[in-house]
Amino acid sequence: MVFMALGLVFTIQNVCSGQSKIDYTNIHPLRWMDPYRNPITYQEYTSSREFAPGLDARLIYTGNKGNVNICIIINASLQLQIQTKFSVFLADLQADGYNPNVYTANNDGDEGALKNLLISEWNSRQIVGTIMIGDLAVPWYEMNEPESWGGAHVEFPIDLYFMDLDGLWTDADSDGMYDDHQDGVGDMEADIWMGRLLAMNLTYHGATERALMDNYFDKNHRYRTGDLRLQDKALAYIDNDWCIYGWEYEVAMAYPQTDPVIDVYQTNREDYMQRVRQSTDNQYENLLICSHSSPWAHYLYWGTGPYDYSLFYNYEIEEIDVQVLFYNLFACSNSRYVEDDDMGDWYIFQTTYGLISLGSSKTGSMLCFYDYYTPLGNGANFGEAFLSWCIDDIETCAGDESRAWFYGMTLLGDPTLKLSRFLPDPTGDVNRDGIIDINDVVYLVNYLYKGGPVPDPLRLGDVTEDCTVNVSDVLFLINYLFKSGPPPGVGCA
């Protein structure tokens, strides 16, 4: 199979042969870069919170329209605020074949009680995944980094705890943080996928948790129905320390059109902003960014000097309207969701774009990318692709340093989403290129008045949902594209 990207020919053979030569125990590690702030500790986190007296988990909805069982747990008070948009999300999930049990719960600080609920669902209904929404208990892990990394003691949230339902997690010093993970009644592999939606600690731009959640579910629905689509291509933006490894070829296993940016004199703040901002309109559906970072900024090299950094900040995501839907953040602690205004969450809760970010809550990120991008490119949803990667790589990819690299990995967003090429063509995308634009108007005009080809299927041109394709559909599409009119309907012609 041949992939094309920027005039380069990518072949599966080249990708695989290149991988065999990479020593993942010798990859330049990511670093915490912020000189003024340190990661919040477990003690600081717990002492700053007021926990509920109990979990009080209540089953409020049982789906019966799908055949793939999942479990959704949502903060009880948040559910009351967002139930209108959340109900649309549930309908979308069931239309895609999922059968959700929905529970409301409180954050009582007891991650074990939350996990027991998942274990019960796994044993009784064989759930394949879970989505946690809002303020819920967070599991923490502690470890010493490898000596080659400096040997520091680190504490971090670990969502793998909720994915492995039959392993053994122990807290030898009884300080509230797990410090070991082994086989239990079953193995220590991840058993289910997990996604987390948490917006309560995002504070910029007048943000409120309710508004951010409502907007996220609105974006989610628009993506599923075809109203929010970008082009079927990816950007691999790889800074100096990792530009030699060919990771852009691994992204190409999901996106045949992958644009690599790996020149050490090119990867910097200004160039990154120019490529991803909406006004440039590159329309990348997916982004891999590899950059030394903190939860609040990317530290991109400026040239080749060891300390010549140019920073892209969390608050700028909204300001420049970053035009990407799906992120892989090879960026130290960028998804440390216990910190206020972490970038992993801002990338998905920005107003216009953003649906999923995959990143780490600690120093480290993903390696062995091909085990993630290959299933994505074969039609798996993001949760399935992440679960597959966890099973294959989380304990082994980097040898003895694997836990240091990977135990902070977390998926923020809705894991049931897939790449747009695996979704139905949206009504209005008459030429079936994945986006609705002026070219579709031209296509309809040519069909109606110049003997051009018939839309296939015809419903793609029936944007007014009157079961015919005529000049009204042309006018409707123009109004939608250029006058902020309503989006196209489903179509029935």
Where would I find each of the regions flagged by the language model?
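Bacterial N-terminal signal peptides
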Residues: V2-Q13
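Residue-level detector of transmembrane insertion/anchoring sites
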Residues: F3-M4, A404, D456
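Serine/threonine-rich, low-complexity intrinsically disordered segments
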Residues: Q13-N14, D466
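Cysteine-dependent hydrolase recognition
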Residues: G18-F422
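Cellulosome-associated attachment modules in secreted, modular CAZymes
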Residues: F422-A493
